[in-house]
Amino acid sequence: MKSIVYEKKLPKLTALEIAKNSKKKVICGMSGGVDSSVSAFILQQQGYQVEGLFMKNWEEDDDTDYCTAANDLADAQAVCDKLGIKLHKINFAAEYWDNVFEHFLAEYKAGRTPNPDILCNKEIKFKAFLEYAVEDLGADYIATGHYVRRSDVNGQTKLLRGLDSNKDQSYFLYTLSKDQVAQSLFPVGEIEKPIVRAIAGDLGLITAEKKDSTGICFIGERKFKDFLERFLPAQPGEIRMVDGKVIGKHDGLMYYTLGQRKGLGIGGVKGLSEDPFYVVDKDLINNVLVVAQGNDNSALLSQGLMATQLYWIDRLPIRQNLRCTVKTRYRQKDVACEVIPINDDCIEVRFDEPQIAVTPGQSAVFYQGEVCLGGGVIERQIK
């Protein structure tokens, strides 16, 4: 199979490089999406022995309208058939439930806002999948459709942002070790998303125009609140202003996140302006949702944060203050900061400029230029 876009846009490998790659077996994670589809094709063009693997990480329930696993598997199989590669199938639902979903529920129950995609990458895609591919399928590498890059210079393996800044997914991969990165290939991390779709179109792949998946994988397109209340009992309570004034009722603290504006159910309040309300705190002890008005309200701002559960790509804890940049949520622009080590599993982070909606349970991920250094889970804000 050939793609004119691929031949025009991607660098050519030498015959020697292709011959070297031909001795290496790569198991490419096939999600049924366009990114993994094109990743498999690129690996083929680079000479690797390529096989696909479809992971089932969630058992379907009665809400068949929301579960796309069967459709995704069919698309992954169609792509592999078109490319002429074998597709393996594996069920990691038990591992996902134990290592990702139960943690997700525990964090929400504790009033924090976790990121299950980060935990899924840590526990499933770059642990269970990697181990299975290497030990059971004889892989030299795994590959995924993540928009990140790998750098190998002077024996040092580093994780870099994806070339397409709009699609960079390094934020979700900060828990990886340099050894895991060294065993992984990220073919689409070197190109931009429109080129990925153009290559898929050239090849006539069924996934060429398929919409990117959004939201949490096990929830799909259903309403988050409806899903969560099936597993955790809601505890309604009061909504109060920062000064303690009661202005409404909330449905349960777990349904709200810091900085949230929509869905608060607060109408016009007598004696107050028309400025929108934002969540600024969750008082777990008293079951109170605290709000303030205006997107520039000082109650929304944090001077820094404390983070724990640290993972550095090189697995070397920092011993002295570090100047770098940080993201406290996906798609946020980098913020200049200073990282102050407290111990091997706790850091203080001081922003150069105050930041809004720093949310416990989410991750703070650190960078120096293009290099992702690692990160940790936000324990609390520093006001």
Swiss-Prot record:
ATP binds at residues 29-36, 55, 145. GO terms for cellular component: cytoplasm. It comes from the Bacteria. Disulfide bonds join 120-217. HAMAP family: tRNA_thiouridyl_MnmA. Catalyzes the 2-thiolation of uridine at the wobble position (U34) of tRNA, leading to the formation of s(2)U34. This is tRNA-specific 2-thiouridylase MnmA. It comes from Histophilus somni (strain 2336) (Haemophilus somnus).
